[in-house]
């Protein structure tokens, strides 16, 4: 395939790769029952003036996931003609496909509109070190266009210490860090909102809230009603079925405070897989590929197993712990 691309991408099917054109939003059809994968990995050629931030804004991708999918590429000057992987193929998060699901480990939100067979997915900025985003099951309790911002005392103190004192209230407008719209969550003190900055989406940059591109939060504003459930999880390893095959998508694990975790990754991936009883029976697993996927943490779904009655994959074996 393409020699610069991450090693595990050699296991991606050609059908999962396509040449990309600009998209307005990642609105994708839900897969059939028993299937878990949406979208396709896309490839573009960078223009001279492109940065990962520009490309991410155009394709609803965050900075961290762009970096992970394109190791070795300069995020601020990829270079004209450089092939860029767009990680726009996703394994849906585990659990009910309803309301909003936020997966901290992938800096991404999924929204399942009621009564429609589609899912919307958007990149997020999450809480930075010392200001972790919560793991919770909550709901949208209010929607506010053109919000003002009343900085909490802790944030005012932080800014004052940096020589950047904040007013008691920041009015609505282009300088407001909440952007043009906010959703208030039932978990006290937490919001989903826009931004007054071009950068920071798909990164650990907020004070615990969830920051979106302004066009994305405005699109959500027109779709998401008050009362919508919001499930916040932290799952770096997602397993999914597609066409009778099992796929793994790996991201850098984060601890409960949103910092990169020192967890035993092999144990964590086995535990995540064992939670999916529907996929762990009668499989032939390619453990070499599993190790590659876990090591790469590039956010790309990769085939790791087939039913035991199918043609065996290279280095395959029945389900065993990673040793």
Regions found by a protein language model. Give the residues of each.
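N-terminal signal peptide c-region/cleavage motif recognized by signal peptidases
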Residues: 20-22
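Gly/Pro-biased beta-strand-loop elements
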Residues: 90-198, 219-222, 250-251, 256-322
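Extracellular LysM carbohydrate-binding repeats and other cell-envelope/extracellular binding modules
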Residues: 26-38, 63-99, 230, 236
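LysM (lysin motif) carbohydrate-binding repeats in extracellular/periplasmic proteins that recognize
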Residues: 47-76, 118
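A short beta-strand-loop micro-motif that forms or neighbors metal/cofactor-
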Residues: 223-239, 243
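Bacterial N-terminal signal peptides that target proteins for export
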Residues: 1-12
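Primarily a LysM-type cell-wall glycan-binding module
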Residues: 27-60
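Short beta-strand-centered segments at strand-helix junctions
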Residues: 206-221
């Amino acid at each position: 395939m393409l020699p610069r691309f991450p090693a595990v991408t050699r296991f991606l099917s050609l059908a999962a790769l396509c040449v990309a054109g600009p998209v307005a939003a990642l609105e994708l059809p839900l897969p059939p029952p028993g299937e878990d994968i949406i979208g396709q990995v896309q490839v573009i050629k960078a223009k001279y003036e492109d940065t990962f931030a520009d490309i991410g804004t155009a394709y609803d991708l965050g900075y961290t996931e762009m970096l992970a999918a394109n190791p070795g590429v300069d995020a601020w000057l990829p270079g004209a003609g450089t092939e860029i992987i767009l990680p726009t193929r996703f394994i849906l998060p585990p659990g009910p496909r309803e309301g909003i699901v936020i997966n901290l480990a992938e800096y991404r939100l999924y929204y399942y509109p009621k009564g429609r067979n589609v899912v919307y997915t958007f990149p997020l900025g999450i809480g930075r070190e010392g200001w972790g985003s919560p793991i919770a099951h909550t709901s949208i309790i209010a929607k506010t266009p053109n919000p003002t911002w009343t900085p909490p005392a802790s944030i005012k103190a932080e800014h004052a210490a940096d020589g950047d004192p904040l007013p008691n209230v920041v009015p609505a407008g282009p300088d407001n860090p909440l952007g043009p719209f906010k959703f208030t969550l039932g978990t006290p003190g937490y919001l989903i909102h826009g931004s007054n900055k071009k950068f920071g989406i798909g990164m650990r940059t907020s004070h615990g809230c969830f920051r979106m591109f302004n066009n994305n939060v405005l699109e959500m504003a027109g779709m998401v009603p008050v009362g919508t459930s919001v499930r916040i999880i932290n799952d770096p390893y997602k397993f999914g079925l597609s066409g009778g095959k099992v796929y793994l998508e790996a991201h850098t694990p984060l601890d409960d405070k949103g910092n990169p975790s020192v967890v035993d990754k092999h144990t964590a991936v086995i535990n995540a897989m064992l939670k999916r009883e529907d996929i762990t029976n009668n499989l032939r697993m390619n453990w070499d590929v599993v190790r590659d996927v876990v090591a790469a943490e590039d956010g790309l779904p990769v085939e790791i197993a087939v039913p035991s009655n199918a043609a065996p994959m290279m280095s395959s074996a029945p389900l065993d712990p990673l040793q």
